C-alpha cells in the first residue's frame, strides 16, 4: 500500500488500496470497522470499538492517568453543561461555502443539542479579518476559542469546517503546534467532534495528527475525539455528526448517558458509507462524558406537596 515508516504498528487498521485519480485522497480510506464485522455479510459493525494510537509505553501510562483524572478529579461546574460550537466561514464571498458550515453548526445547536445545555458559539463569519503576508488570519477567533476552553470550559467542543491533520480553516484559527500547548484545561477536558477532513489521520507513522496530540496533551486538551482519518464531504459530515450528538444525549435503560463505545456502535448501525467508515473514536469506549447527572424535581412549595390541588377564587 506504499506505506513506509520506521515505527511499529501493533494494531494496524484496515487500509484501502491506493487510488490513483483526480480524487485520490477521498477515494482512499483507513478503518477499523472492517475488523468489527464478525456476523453476517452486511456492512454494520457487530461490536463497539475505538482506538487510542499510543506511541510509547510512557504515553500509555499517561493516557490511563489522564482518563482517571477526568473521571475523579474534574472540576464540577457550568462547563459540564456547556457546548462550544466553532464554525468555518468561506474562503471567499463568491460561494455559499461559509454559510454551509455555519448552518451545519446551527443545525446541531437547534436539532441535536438539548435546550438545557448552554451553547457558546464561535463563528468565523462574525470575526474581523487581518491580512498578513502569509494570508488571511482571524486571531480573535483563536483567542475566543482558548477562552472558551481554558476559562469557561466545555464538556463538548464542536468544529464544523475545513481542516487537515494540523490546522482548522484557511485562517489557521487552530494550529497543532501552537494552539494545543495553550489549552491548559486539565480539570475541564472537552470531548471534540470534528466534522472536517483528516484531522484524525493517525496512521501516518511519521507525524501525529491534531486529534492525537489533543488526547496526548499533558496540560489539557481533549479526553477523546470523534473525527475522520481522511478527506470527507461536508454534506455527509453533517449527517453523521447529527447522529453522533443524538446518541450523546441519549440515556440508557439505567437512566445514565451512553458510553462512548455504545454511541459509536449505534452511529455505525445507521451509517456505514465510505465517508462514514473514515470516522474514528479516539478514546476510551467505556467512558461516559461528565454531563450533569443530577435531576431536580419539585415535590413541595412552602411545605405543600405539588400534587395538592389549589382552589381558585372567582374573578
Which residue ranges define each predicted feature?
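Cysteine-dependent hydrolase recognition
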Residues: 1-315
